[in-house]
C-alpha cells in the first residue's frame, strides 16, 4: 500500500518542498514540532500572527510562502498518521519527494518523538467535521418530451450530517445541544450513479486493506 508516493507530485507540493529545503534546519525542526502537535486540532492556529511575522522576516519569505510551508508540513504528517507510518517508513516515503536529506531527518525525528501522542489523539477524533448520520433516496422520473413516452430517470440521494465540534469533549453534556444538522441532496443519472458506485467500491477496498 505504501509502495506508491503517498504525498503525490503536485506543483504546489513541490514548490513548498523547494522552499523548505532552503530553510535553516534547526529552526525548521522547531516549526515541525509545533505543526505535528496541531494535527487533528481543527481551526487552531499553529503560530500566532506575531510569531508568523517574526518567522517570515527570519526566513525572508512572504506570508503566502510561509502558509504553503505550514500546509505542506501538515499534509505530510496527516498522511503519515493516516497510514500509521513508522519513522523509517516515513523516511522511505520522503525519499520519493524532492526533500533534502537534512529536512527528511527532521521529519523522522519529530515523528519519532510525537507519533504515539498524535495517533492516540486522532483515534479519539473524527477527521472530518461533518459526520454522516442518515442516508435517504428516491427515484425521479421526467418525461423527455410531450410527444414521446420515454422517461428520463434519475436517483435523488439525501445525506444528513451531524456537524459536531469534538474539540469540546470535556463538555459532552452540553455538546448534545450544540449539534448542527446539515443536509446535502445529490442527483445522479444512470452513468453518474455507476461511477459513484465504483468510487465507493474503490474506497471500500482501501478500507478493507487497513482493517
UniProtKB/Swiss-Prot annotation:
Q: Which InterPro entries match?
A: COMM, COMMD10
Q: Which PROSITE patterns match?
A: COMM
Query: Which parts of the sequence belong to the COMM domain?
Result: 131-211
Quaternary data: Component of the commander complex consisting of the CCC subcomplex and the retriever subcomplex. Component of the CCC subcomplex.
Please describe what this protein does.
Scaffold protein in the commander complex that is essential for endosomal recycling of transmembrane cargos; the commander complex is composed of the CCC subcomplex and the retriever subcomplex.
Family in the record: Belongs to the COMM domain-containing protein 10 family.
Name under which the protein is recorded: COMM domain-containing protein 10
Its source organism is: Dictyostelium discoideum
Underlying gene: commd10
